[in-house]
Amino acid sequence: MAKALTLANPKFGIMLCGTCGNGKTTLLRAFQLLLNFLNGKGYFEQSTGIRIVDAKDISALMRDPHTKTVRNTPMLAIEDMGREATEVLDYGNVLSPVVDLLEYRYNEQLFTFITTNLNAKDVRQKYGARIADRFNEMLCVIPFTASSFRGKTLNT
């Protein structure tokens, strides 16, 4: 992750992707704690931090005018992207809250973290070629290839 943040031509986002339970969320939360610590020590000219939002909660946040500010958060993390419904109905209108949020953040070049269990093919299939193509420009992808750290999984 340090390499992704210090590239000569940095992208304005990081995607942590891989199977369940291999440390994506743990790394994101550790980075959030590090920024909070450094912020408290005065290492930044402006207050900075990461707001973490579960992908399933984005549709509710984007409908509420008071919480629409989530889209302008300087550093936003979308946790577990891919678990949410791609489209939602709002008074008869079909909305794509995560896609709309990602397109907005792409256009404004706002730093976005994403954790997901989806691979590149799954992202293209769920969100379409347009978002997948924008991710190529926007995100430094860090694959997590380890198996689950949570122990034995249930065989179902």
Give the predicted meaning of each segment:
Residues 21-24:
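Conserved glycine(s) of the Walker
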Residues 43-107:
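Conserved nucleotide-sensing/catalytic segment adjacent to the nucleotide-binding pocket
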Residues 13:
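Walker A (P-loop) ATP-phosphate-binding motif of ABC ATPase nucleotide-binding domains
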Residues 33-36:
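Walker A/P-loop NTP-binding motif
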Residues 1-8:
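Pre-Walker A adenine-sensing motif
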Residues 27, 31:
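Hydrophobic positions on the alpha1 helix immediately C-terminal to the Walker A/P-loop
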Residues 16:
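Hydrophobic anchor at the beta1->P-loop junction of P-loop NTPases
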